[in-house]
UniProtKB/Swiss-Prot annotation:
Quaternary structure and partners: Forms oligomers.
UniProt protein name: Transcriptional regulator MraZ
Subcellular location as annotated: Cytoplasm, Nucleoid
Top-level taxonomic group: Bacteria
GO cellular component terms attached to this protein's record: cytoplasm; nucleoid
Principal location listed in the UniProt entry: cytoplasm
Organism in which the protein naturally occurs: Leuconostoc mesenteroides subsp. mesenteroides (strain ATCC 8293 / DSM 20343 / BCRC 11652 / CCM 1803 / JCM 6124 / NCDO 523 / NBRC 100496 / NCIMB 8023 / NCTC 12954 / NRRL B-1118 / 37Y)
Amino acid sequence: MFMGEYSHTLDTKSRLIIPAKFRNQLGDQFIITKWMEKSLRAMPMAVWEKLQEQLNQLPLGKKDARAFRRFVMAGALEAEFDKQGRIVVPNNLREYASLEKSVVVTGVGDSFEIWSAENWSAYTAETADDFDNIAEGLVDFDL
């Protein structure tokens, strides 16, 4: 399970070190894709395969379903670590997520997200202000 919040730095060659706890769970190859709230989502191949199945079941007659499927699939790439446990974040993903120097890597259960520190700070401030309402909206899920 991926959990926790880690601050890291993107170097001048667009390399990002991934926490060792996360690397151990990913395996040799994994997927990174564009995700919601201007973040990137990284996941083991098994999680990606499940997500692909879910995307393939979206109703192609609905414009939003086609858009979401295209966005996630077109934004995806297979990634692997270098010897120092880093990944290279390609320009298109770096630009989408506004990744510059300061980056936050956050565990979200079956995967983890990569955020610009600025976007993460804004997101967590907004979410913290509304956390009680968010939790109440999820009462049916027995959390």
